[in-house]
Swiss-Prot record:
The keyword Cytoplasm applies. It comes from Bordetella avium (strain 197N). GO terms for molecular function: 1-(5-phosphoribosyl)-5-[(5-phosphoribosylamino)methylideneamino]imidazole-4-carboxamide isomerase activity. Pfam families: His_biosynth. Keywords: Amino-acid biosynthesis, Cytoplasm, Histidine biosynthesis, Isomerase. It comes from the Bacteria. Signal peptide: none annotated. GO terms for biological process: L-histidine biosynthetic process; L-tryptophan biosynthetic process. This is 1-(5-phosphoribosyl)-5-[(5-phosphoribosylamino)methylideneamino] imidazole-4-carboxamide isomerase. Pathway: Amino-acid biosynthesis; L-histidine biosynthesis; L-histidine from 5-phospho-alpha-D-ribose 1-diphosphate: step 4/9. Belongs to the HisA/HisF family. HAMAP family: HisA.
Length: 246
């Protein structure tokens, strides 16, 4: 079970949002690269970056801190990024800069042809981010709820050739209210590619619950507020996950 620390970037700083609300921000650091170095030292095997300004603007907006993070971690661990990725040129620039995986969310839902092209152009490097509330997909930084069913879209995107799916329950994200294991497992059982859980992970009980369903295809989890506020010790959590799923 791969536990992935999240670094959410807004105005060059490392922040966390509650339920995706850009007006409900907690700033954790003015130095995202130092945060990245810390997670590397704690034993992280991958980092998850989100360009929050980019998600709203539809194009990269935190290039300086992203570049600093990539310099800080070097070739030690892969880095994945999402937020505002709407065209193949942006993907290519990120991959050329040293990003290992690019996460496409809103653009995949609004323009499936773009996702199809991206999976063809950059095989093995495209992850789809599906954000949902009550089984329905949300887009545009979670500001718009659609009628798309998460299971139907996941299957369609798997057929396109995406590498994995990050499933975020936006009703729980940033709330430390517990991960939605049932919904995550339902999705993982519906596809053959890896699913990473995100949203609401509050403590070790959630990690253990996810480890129990790894065989269903839940291969990892994105950790945010819990590891920044001390509800979860990342190093201890990854060690426990390794113990349960080795």
């Amino acid at each position: 079970m791969l536990l992935i620390p999240a670094i959410d970037l807004k105005d060059g700083r490392c922040v966390r949002l509650r339920q995706g609300d850009l007006d409900d921000v907690t700033v954790f650091s003015e130095d995202p690269a130092a945060i990245a170095s810390n997670w590397l030292a704690q034993g992280a095997r991958r980092l998850h970056l989100v360009d929050l300004n980019g998600a709203v603007a539809g194009k990269p907006k935190n290039e300086a801190p992203i570049k600093a993070i990539l310099k800080a971690v070097g070739d030690d661990i892969p880095v994945q990024i999402g937020g505002g990725i709407r065209d193949l040129d942006t993907i290519e620039r990120y991959l050329d800069a040293g990003i290992s995986y690019v996460i496409i969310g809103t653009a995949a839902v609004k323009n499936p042809g773009f996702l199809h092209d991206a999976c063809g152009a950059f095989p093995g490097q495209i992850i789809v981010g599906l954000d949902a509330r009550d089984g329905k997909i949300a887009t545009d930084g979670w500001s718009k709820l659609t009628r798309h069913d998460v299971l139907d879209l996941a299957k369609k995107f798997e057929d396109y050739g995406c590498e994995a799916i990050i499933y975020t329950d936006i009703g729980r994200d940033g709330m430390l209210s517990g991960v939605n294991v049932e919904a995550t497992v339902r999705l993982a059982q519906h596809v053959r590619i890896p699913v990473y859980a995100s949203g609401g992970i509050a403590g070790m009980a959630d990690i253990e619950a996810l480890c129990a369903v790894e065989a269903d295809g839940v291969e990892g989890a994105i950790l945010g507020r819990s590891i920044y506020e001390g509800a979860l010790d990342f190093k201890v959590a990854q060690a426990r996950a390794d113990e349960l799923t080795s």
